[in-house]
Amino acid sequence: MHAKSSFWIVPALFFLAAAFINIYGNMKGLAIAGTVKPALLPLLAVTTLVAAGGADTRDTRRLVLAQLLGCTGDTLLLFTGFYPFIGGMLAFLMGHLCYISLFGGTSWKGFGLKTWIPALVIMGGIVAGLIRLIGVEGDLLVPMCVYGMVLMLLIFSGLSGVFRCRGNAWWLVLAGALLFTFSDALIALETFSEEPQRWIPATIMVTYLAAQSLLAAGALHIKKR
């Protein structure tokens, strides 16, 4: 799936403008940050569609679906409480699964149990360590463990692509997956911390938007064989 049109620059500029407003608003504690947040991923989705030349391939449709699920998660997390948080995380999880199906379908070809068993053990250990570090407990422990494993699979799909597939675009995928994990870890830290830090909201958005952009750029430049 390659970028086919240079007209993507126009919606990309709108996306960058909205991203700047959101990040600046988060830094200053302004309400406008929440106002523009639901528009961010739709603008990125439009950029993706224009760059790809339309939604005529399954890969493009999966990529755009992941972005729109991100928009759903963004919107739900504007509200406080247990159910908006769970709904937002569920939307993001479904988006991650779209990304995993998009990238892992290529980078995991030929993997057997000799690869998957140690990989899953390592990923499980990393998730357990992060969960313990952040201090997740109670009813959210199991859901967050599942969510963490999905993030590890996303990272693994990018890492596998870097070492097994041709093209520098896989580095974009890996970087996007790592930034997504860092951003989500900050969301968990903010949620479960008794004294959230003022710098966290803006940092979440910077890393999150960079992650979404890198995953989109990687997908658009990966040549499917």
Can you name each region flagged by the protein language model?
Residues 1-225:
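Polytopic alpha-helical membrane-helix bundles and their juxtamembrane interface segments
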